[in-house]
């Protein structure tokens, strides 16, 4: 049975699916504009996608911009994500730089949740998870498949592997090649929900998989990602439309 996680009074893993909005910007001016544009949008979690920054190779600059986000959204849970090129991100970097950056963000205690890529070396991943939790930051372990949807058993196994590494939240995103692939992801989500003790987050990407971003509460995905000003992944739905649809589904269930 999945246990919930409470971050800044936001309950993840129980009740309605929470909406995370990615903050995508190249520099300080764009970040300021994005923060202004999203401030009244109906989202629950802010995800800062630092890999989109032009200064993504500077840890000091990233810390500065993260502080800006934290100051602008003091009451929202802040998820820090630095997606590497190999998993669909905008910045290719070494393992050494990646974990040095994560450690710096963890030590700063600016984010409430930190994204850690599962397949980055088990020892380093476990150390990052432990360091995050020691500093009061939830660890979200993730994996992304941008070209295929693995079999149901493999998806469930990866989510379980994340939990075994100590994750507070387990996330996987896959790319469907058919409608059947979307059903595979949803079936895997339902199965993982039955087995996992931590909140899980799943999505089938692209237009074909968009329905998975709306069905989390039914199948067991705790967070859905909706675009604020710019998509950070294929198939994201605008935050306002996403909220309206989730409200409609919830209210129409009576």
From Swiss-Prot:
Source superkingdom: Bacteria
Matching InterPro entries: Aldolase_TIM (IPR013785), DHquinase_I (IPR001381), Type-I_3-dehydroquinase (IPR050146)
GO molecular function: 3-dehydroquinate dehydratase activity
A GO biological-process term: 3,4-dihydroxybenzoate biosynthetic process
Pathway(s) the chain acts in: Metabolic intermediate biosynthesis; chorismate biosynthesis; chorismate from D-erythrose 4-phosphate and phosphoenolpyruvate: step 3/7
Catalytic activity annotation: 3-dehydroquinate = 3-dehydroshikimate + H2O
Entry EC number(s): 4.2.1.10
EC category: lyase
Active site: residue positions: 144, 171
Binding positions (3-dehydroquinate): 47-49, 83, 213, 232, 236
Keywords from the UniProt entry: Amino-acid biosynthesis, Aromatic amino acid biosynthesis, Lyase, Schiff base
Subunit relationships: Homodimer.
Family indicated by similarity: Belongs to the type-I 3-dehydroquinase family.
Described purpose of this protein according to its UniProt entry: Involved in the third step of the chorismate pathway, which leads to the biosynthesis of aromatic amino acids. Catalyzes the cis-dehydration of 3-dehydroquinate (DHQ) and introduces the first double bond of the aromatic ring to yield 3-dehydroshikimate.
The protein, known as: 3-dehydroquinate dehydratase
Classification of source organism: Bacteria, Pseudomonadati, Pseudomonadota, Betaproteobacteria, Neisseriales
């Amino acid at each position: 049975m999945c246990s919930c996680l409470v971050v800044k009074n936001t309950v993840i893993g129980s009740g309605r699916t929470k909406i995370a909005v990615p903050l995508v910007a190249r520099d300080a001016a764009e970040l300021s504009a994005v923060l202004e544009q999203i401030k009244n949008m109906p989202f629950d979690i802010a995800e800062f996608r630092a890999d989109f920054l032009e200064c993504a190779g500077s840890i000091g600059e990233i810390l500065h911009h993260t502080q800006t986000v934290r100051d602008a959204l003091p009451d929202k849970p802040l998820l820090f994500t630095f997606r590497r090129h190999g998993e669909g991100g905008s910045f290719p970097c070494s393992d050494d730089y990646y974990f040095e950056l994560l450690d710096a963000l963890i030590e700063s205690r600016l984010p409430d949740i930190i994204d850690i890529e599962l397949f980055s070396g088990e020892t380093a991943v476990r150390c990052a998870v432990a360091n995050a939790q020691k500093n009061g930051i939830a660890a979200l372990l993730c994996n992304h498949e941008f070209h295929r949807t693995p079999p149901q058993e493999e998806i469930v196994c990866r989510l379980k592997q994340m939990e075994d590494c100590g994750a507070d939240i387990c996330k996987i995103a896959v790319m469907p090649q058919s409608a059947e692939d979307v059903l595979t992801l949803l079936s895997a989500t339902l199965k993982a929900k039955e087995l996992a003790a931590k909140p899980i987050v799943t999505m089938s990407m692209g237009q074909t998989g968009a329905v998975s971003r709306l069905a989390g509460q039914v199948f067991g995905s705790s967070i859905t990602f909706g675009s604020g000003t710019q998509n950070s992944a294929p198939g994201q739905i605008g935050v306002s439309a996403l909220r309206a649809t989730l409200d409609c589904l919830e209210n129409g269930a009576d």
